[in-house]
Amino acid sequence: MKFLGIDYGQRRTGIAVTDAGGRMAFPRRTIAMTTRDAFFVELLGMVEVECPDAFVVGLPRLPGGEETLTTRQVRNFVERLKRRTTLPVYFMPEELSSFEAEDDLRDAGLRGRRLEAVVDQQAAVRILESFLAVPEERRSLA
C-alpha cells in the first residue's frame, strides 16, 4: 500500500509519501495555509498525482498521552478531510516529530529559510516511518 503522510499545522502542513510497497517514506511538499479551500485543493491535487491508498496523519499529544488544542485541531482537520475523500485515514500518535525533524535537518547542515522550507515535510516522513514500523493489526483508523 502507498501512504500519504501529513504533519498538519495551522500555518504549514508537511506532506510525505511512501513508495508503492509502503516500505520507505519520502518528503514531497509543504502546503502553506492561506485559506481552507485553497489548502484542500492543493492537498487533493497531490492525491491525484501521488495516488495513495490511505492517509496517515500525525496526532500530537503530550508525553503523558494528554490531548491538547493542537490535537483537537488535527482531529477537526481529519473530519474535514474525510468529508472530501473516500480514502481511509489513519492516526499516528506523535510526540515532538517537528523538533526531531528540525534536529535531523540541522545535523544535515540546513539552516534558516532552507530548513523552514522542508522541516514540515521531514516531520511527515518521521510520522510515516513510525507508522510503517507498527504492525498492521495495531494501526488505528481515524
UniProtKB/Swiss-Prot annotation:
Similarity field: Belongs to the YqgF nuclease family.
Organism superkingdom: Bacteria
Disulphide bridges: none
Cross-referenced SUPFAM superfamilies: Ribonuclease H-like (SSF53098)
GO MF annotations, alphabetized: nuclease activity
Enzyme class: hydrolase
A GO biological process held by the record: rRNA 5'-end processing
Localization per Swiss-Prot or TrEMBL: Cytoplasm
Function: Could be a nuclease involved in processing of the 5'-end of pre-16S rRNA.
Main location: cytoplasm
Cellular compartments per GO CC: cytosol
EC number per UniProt: 3.1.-.-
Protein name: Putative pre-16S rRNA nuclease
Keyword terms: Cytoplasm, Hydrolase, Nuclease, Ribosome biogenesis
